[in-house]
């Protein structure tokens, strides 16, 4: 009787859309296959241009505001680290979860969610725009790495399990669905990735990435708000302030009641690490207290999910569709409270809203400029795609792909040039 332990991931999970030939540039006598398939996937994401562009894309405040702003790139690195830590506790492949964290925002356009809103308006005639669907499009076609037998790009040619791990919303756009994971143009690779998967259910690795994302941006947005003196954590201990936040949260998060949010605010305000921050004054002691707070909260939220999932699923490696991630409702409520703090004191600031309106106008202007002058106004890869497009919708999709690929600096230079201030894109 064999005692060999079964591999958690099989050949089906490691399959790529295009079979790749061995590398040919190695020196004689060297071993070129020392990495796992998922380690190669992680490296491909880490080295791709789309990831580097996130350094000049907004997380909450602009990437050039202050000395140490969080950008989409630094946020993605933090999500990858939190996800990797959770994967250790759950038995998922570490490279698989880490690459999901690295790639989870890789499709974000300039100005983050605000840019998503503008591009969704631009793309109304060709299926809309959604950052998660753009993630998938970048990884499966737009990012140049591997061609199929017809000379068409298959993007980074990641394994099935890797692409599935990045897919938070495994369905196309529908009438009642605000979030979706695939454009209609990308259904063929989507069907390949989701072959045999339970309908509308993300794999465990994607669920881990999703929770790591929630934890990262809820905790770190509050940290940035405290540093910028926009958020004072003492409001959590003030009954009237907490009640107002809970009322706002109830309207924003349908799954959590105002009473649950009030209780969550009370639990958070009672934590010694929260009380230690007090009125932040940027001294050494205050900076240490704030960093201790973020570390403790990330650990609190991640470890709660690990423990609850283990209690439900048992020991051993948990991978793919063997389990779902379980997060205690009280922990979800605490994370929601942190999100509400950022919403109330950062995102709802009138100056922030005015800036966002100007950003959306800029995206609309540049879209009109690119479409009117295409293919001349497009980068060579996008110009070729524009020429090959069969209808106006497909051509607009190419323009949207081009804008989504821009850094904020490049978008602003192009817009400034067309407005006539002498700068060039």
From Swiss-Prot:
A biological-process GO annotation: dGTP catabolic process
Sequence segments annotated as region (Disordered): 1-35
SMART domains linked: HDc
Name assigned to this protein: Deoxyguanosinetriphosphate triphosphohydrolase-like protein
GO molecular function: dGTPase activity
PANTHER family according to UniProt: DEOXYGUANOSINETRIPHOSPHATE TRIPHOSPHOHYDROLASE, DEOXYNUCLEOSIDE TRIPHOSPHATE TRIPHOSPHOHYDROLASE
Keywords: Hydrolase
InterPro entries on file: dGTPase, dGTPase-like, dNTPase_2, HD/PDEase_dom, HD_domain, PHydrolase_assoc_dom
HD domain boundaries: 72-218
The family this protein is said to belong to: Belongs to the dGTPase family. Type 2 subfamily.
């Amino acid at each position: 009787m064999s005692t060999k332990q079964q591999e958690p991931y099989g050949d089906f999970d490691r399959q790529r859309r295009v079979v790749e030939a061995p590398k040919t540039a190695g020196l004689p006598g060297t071993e070129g296959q020392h990495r796992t398939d998922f380690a190669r996937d992680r490296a491909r994401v880490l080295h791709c241009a789309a990831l580097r562009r996130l350094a000049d894309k907004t997380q909450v405040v602009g990437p050039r505001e202050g000395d140490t702003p969080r950008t989409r790139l630094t946020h993605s690195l933090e999500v990858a680290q939190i996800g990797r830590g959770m994967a250790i506790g759950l038995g998922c492949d570490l490279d698989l979860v880490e690459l999901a964290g690295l790639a989870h925002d890789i499709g974000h356009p300039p100005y983050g969610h605000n840019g998503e809103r503008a591009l969704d308006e631009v793309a109304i005639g060709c299926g809309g725009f959604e950052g998660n669907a753009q993630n998938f499009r970048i990884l499966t076609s737009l990012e140049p790495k591997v061609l199929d037998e017809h000379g068409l790009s298959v993007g980074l040619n990641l394994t099935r399990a890797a692409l599935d791990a990045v897919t938070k919303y495994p369905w196309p756009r529908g009438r009642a669905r605000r979030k979706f994971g695939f454009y209609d143009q990308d259904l063929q690779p989507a069907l390949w990735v989701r072959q045999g998967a339970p309908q509308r259910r993300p794999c465990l690795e994607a669920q881990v990435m999703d929770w790591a994302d929630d934890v990262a941006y809820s905790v770190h947005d509050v940290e940035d708000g405290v540093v910028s003196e926009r958020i004072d954590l003492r409001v959590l201990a003030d009954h009237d302030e907490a009640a107002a936040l809970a009322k706002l949260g109830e309207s924003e998060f349908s799954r959590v009641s105002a009473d649950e949010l009030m209780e969550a605010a009370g639990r958070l305000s009672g934590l010694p690490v929260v009380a230690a921050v007090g009125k932040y004054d940027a001294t050494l002691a205050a900076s240490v207290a704030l960093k201790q707070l973020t570390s403790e909260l990330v650990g609190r939220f991640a470890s709660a999910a690990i423990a609850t999932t283990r209690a439900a699923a048992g020991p051993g490696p948990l991978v793919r569709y063997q389990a779902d991630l379980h997060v205690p409702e009280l922990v979800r409520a605490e994370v929601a409270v942190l999100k509400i703090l950022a919403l109330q004191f950062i995102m709802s600031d009138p100056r922030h809203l005015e800036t966002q309106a100007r950003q959306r106008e800029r995206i609309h202007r540049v879209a009109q400029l690119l479409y009117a002058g295409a293919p001349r106004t497009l980068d060579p890869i996008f110009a070729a795609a524009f020429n090959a497009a069969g209808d106006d919708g497909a051509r607009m999709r190419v323009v949207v792909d081009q804008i989504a690929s821009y850094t904020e600096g490049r978008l602003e230079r192009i817009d400034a040039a067309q407005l006539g201030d002498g700068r060039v894109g």
